[in-house]
Each structure stands twice: as structure tokens, then as C-alpha cells.
Amino acid sequence: DTYIVVNKGYIGENIYGGGYAGTVYNTKVEVTEEEYNQIYVGLNVFGGGKGVSATVYNTTNVLIDLKLDMEVTEEEVSTAEITSGQTKVEVEILNTYSKILGSVYGGGDLGQVGQGVINTSNNTAAISKEGTTYVEIKNGYIEGSVFGGGSGVPTVEKYELRMGTIYGSTRTIVNGGYIKGNVYGGGTQSRVYFSNKDDASIIYATNVLIEEKEEKIVINGSVFGGGDRGNSATTNASVPTTIGDVLVTIITFFSELTFMN
């Protein structure tokens, strides 16, 4: 097993819970700021490893908890500005001493979580070892997006179908913080295959009461139960796949909303 803890410091590129083309059983990555010790991550945080042959057999666990103070104001806008009944949210970030300039992934950078073989004829997978990713965002500034799955976007390698695949399930929880991009239950241009009819990927965006103080959540983009298709410039832009049921739950201080797909 591997356990990475970052409490302060400057990391110019990526953080990987797994290995570089290597294999591990479980990974745990904690990027947690203590006593306002600045943490700066120049690129991304991955629960899994780097490279198409990198594998995490069992589980990945990623926790992000950075200091962030922000003021969030919601106000009704006039009909002259926008469609009647809609609101406008103003966000003032009071400090960004610590930040992640890229995205956060439960899976790997081309690497897999769990083990299986993809059947291209019917877009299913025979799973020999089921894996699970856990991502929890407690607080902090994230410039990119949050993914329960992995990244299947090659840079110099030839594209392979298994890149960034999760053979199992994903769990993503957002308790607070500012996410400039989107939140996905799946990965980016990668696949999540589940072994039975349970949830293929689950994403929670929660706004809970902690120590008598309501934690603020701002997601500048959208929330998706599935994955990100990427852009038209990539050769594998049409591959994000989630096999199984999708449950999206948004929990606020006032109510709980559940959407089934």
C-alpha cells in the first residue's frame, strides 16, 4: 500500500497515489493544509498511477482539505438582465494561499483501478478484480475539475481503450470549497465498468453543517453522474462510458435531492 500526505510546500507538477507504470494494492493521498501552511500543486492530483500499465488492484482514496475563505451572495436579478425568476451568485474569494491548479482524479493518469478485460464487441468488461475510488473534497480552491474516475487522455502514447479505466465503482463527495470546473462521477475520456447492477458511479455534492458553521460550496461548472467526453480535437473523445445505474445526490443544509438515471 502507499500513503502520501502533503501538509505544506510547492509541487510543480502532479501528485500520484500509485506508481509510474507500477502496481500497488491500495493508495491513499491526503492534501490537507494545517495552520495555514501554504500548499501549491501546479498540475493534478491522482489517486492512481501514471502510465497505461500502472494499476491499483483494490482502492484509491483521495482527500483534499485546503484553507479557503470566501463570501457567497445570492440575489435575484431583474427581468431586464436575465429570465425572470433566475438568480445571480456573486463569489468573493478572500484568500487563495493554497490551491490546486489542475484537477483531482480518483483514478490514474492512464492507469487502471481494478482489473478486467474490455469486450469491444458489446462494450462490456469481464472484471477479475473489482476496484473502488473514493474522492472527498472538504475545502479548498481547485482550478480544474473533480473526477471520481481516471484520465484516459494520452500525451505521446498511442491511445488504448483501457486507459484510465475503473473496473468497479467510484465515490465522490464534495463537502465544501471552490471548484472552477465541473464535478464528474466518472473520468475524463475513460470508462467505469461495474460488476453487477448496483451503482456504476455515485457523486455527492454536500453542503453540511460542521461545528455550527455552514461550509460553502461553489461549483462554477456543472455536476455529472457520468464522465467527460473531452473535446473534438482528441481521437478518443467519444469513449466516456459508465455501465450500470447512476445515482446523483445533492445534499444541502435545507434539503436533499436525489436523481436516478
Question: Where are these predicted regions, by residue range?
Answer:
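Surface-exposed loop/turn motifs in large extracellular/passenger domains
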Residues: 1-14, 19-145, 150-261
